[in-house]
Regions:
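Conserved hydrophobic ligand-interaction patch in extracellular adhesion modules
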Residues: 61-107
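Short, structured beta-strand segments at or near domain termini in extracellular proteins/domains
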Residues: 160-180
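Acidic glycine-/aspartate-rich tracts in secreted/extracellular proteins
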Residues: 82-85, 95, 107-110, 120, ...
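Surface-exposed ligand-recognition segments of extracellular binding domains, strongest
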Residues: 99-143
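Extracellular disulfide-stabilized recognition modules
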Residues: 14-73, 180
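Disulfide-stabilized extracellular ectodomain repeats and their linkers
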Residues: 58-61, 65, 74, 86, ...
Length: 180
């Protein structure tokens, strides 16, 4: 079966980044390079929260990461490489009362990897899951994608390996290249 490409539908965003007031109302921060609505910035990255711009749609892992790629050059699912980025994710999930989101994390060659290509460090794996075992546990036998779940197993906002066919929203990330 042929799968149609996922095209992001951009609605009026509700930014968490500072909003400036213009003559006609709030001015939503935009990516400095692509014009994509940006919900948060941290270091050299910009973040776009899919649920704030697509009518709260959810996607399989492939569809979610395709959504990010369709935002434009350099956009991909979030790679949680620092504790600060993990905190940004947890704050977004808490503030918007989300049950879960996808990341770019995917199992490759017997270990998880980020789309960014940066070293994968398991900063926030859950201590439990559906079988009460620490994550990643590959409980369903095909849990090859990394999601962040909001207290699903009474464990707080933690990382879980999940089968990629489940539907979730995603945080998209764009690294800003600063020319000096």
């Amino acid at each position: 079966a042929t799968v149609a490409p996922v095209r992001p539908v951009v609605h009026q965003p509700v930014p968490v980044a500072p909003v400036h007031r213009g003559r006609s109302g709030p001015v939503v921060p935009q990516s400095v390079t692509s014009g994509v609505p940006v919900d948060q910035r941290l270091g050299d990255s910009e973040y776009h929260f899919s649920w704030r711009h697509d009518g709260s749609k959810t996607y399989t892992w492939d569809g979610a990461n395709q959504y990010c790629g369709n935002l434009g050059s350099g956009w991909q699912g979030i790679s949680i490489e620092t504790r600060q980025e993990d905190s940004l994710v947890r704050e977004a999930i808490t503030e918007d009362h989300l049950p879960w989101i996808w990341t770019s994390g995917q199992l490759k060659n017997h270990g998880f990897a980020w789309a960014s290509g940066e070293e994968f460090v398991g900063l926030n794996w859950s201590h439990t899951g559906g079988n009460h075992r620490p994550q990643p546990d590959n409980r369903e036998g095909n849990e090859n994608c990394l999601g962040v779940l909001n207290n699903v197993y009474d464990d707080g906002i933690k990382w879980h390996d999940i089968a990629c066919h489940h539907d979730k929203a995603i945080i998209c990330e764009h690294k800003v290249r600063v020319h000096g």
